[in-house]
Amino acid sequence: MTSVRKRKMNRSSVKKVSRRNKDKQKKKLIACNPIIAKNWDYSLTLAQNYEKLGLKAKLQTPAGGQEAKYDTVIKKEATIDPVTQFGEDSDSDSEEDSSNSQEDNEGQNVEDIDENEIPEGEARIIRDAEGNVVKVVYGKKKVFDIDDDIDTIKAKLADQQKEETEVVKQLEAFASRPIVKKERVQSPREVEWLEKLYKKHGDNYKAMFFDRKLNIYQQSEGEIKRKMRKWKSENNIA
């Protein structure tokens, strides 16, 4: 047997508020920017959309948890040759490889390494056939010259960066558009208030500041002076 309260609820025409049928995967409309909203794919995640548009979801370097890209094939070479792993000729092959590597190391000339082609802050280690360090060549190539202009440095940075997408170009053009500055218009009540102050005190802004009846919002002397200057220019008052 139900209680009186339950019977009243059942007879009531007001429906029960329930979130059971609420769509949790509700489509969130992008209204911040018309270009992003036009190119936004609602079937992708935020990070996937940003990558597709050529933007960054996080400014800092990601610490992990990135989505794996299955379209790129990464080939890894085996450390041990599977054919000769259990064969009889494995020892002879390894000896030939070691002799070839020794010949390559011995044939490497120090003069072939140009220190001006190595970036500043890096070095190349030259070893002999036994693996001992013969010489360390430090780089002298400067990434940015101090004497270069800002335009030259920007051009170098632009060359190093990857090619921008069409969406990024549209966003840059949208951001660099000329914006007309909208000046503030004084309201009718503000004009009436300034007129009363001028008729009562003239150009005595200090008296306007200490007027308790008119300056009820305790505006400073400088604020009243700026508003009064604008009001005078609009009404052609010297």
From Swiss-Prot:
Cited PANTHER family: HSPC111 PROTEIN-RELATED, NUCLEOLAR PROTEIN 16
Domain of life: Eukaryota
Biased composition (Acidic residues): 88-120
Family, as annotated: Belongs to the NOP16 family.
Presence of the UniProt keyword rRNA processing in the record: yes
One Gene Ontology cellular component: preribosome, large subunit precursor
Function (record text): Involved in the biogenesis of the 60S ribosomal subunit.
Region ranges (Disordered): 1-26, 80-122
Gene name in the database record: NOP16
Protein name: Nucleolar protein 16
Subcellular location: Nucleus, Nucleolus
Pfam family, one: Nop16
Assembly behavior: Component of the pre-66S ribosomal particle.
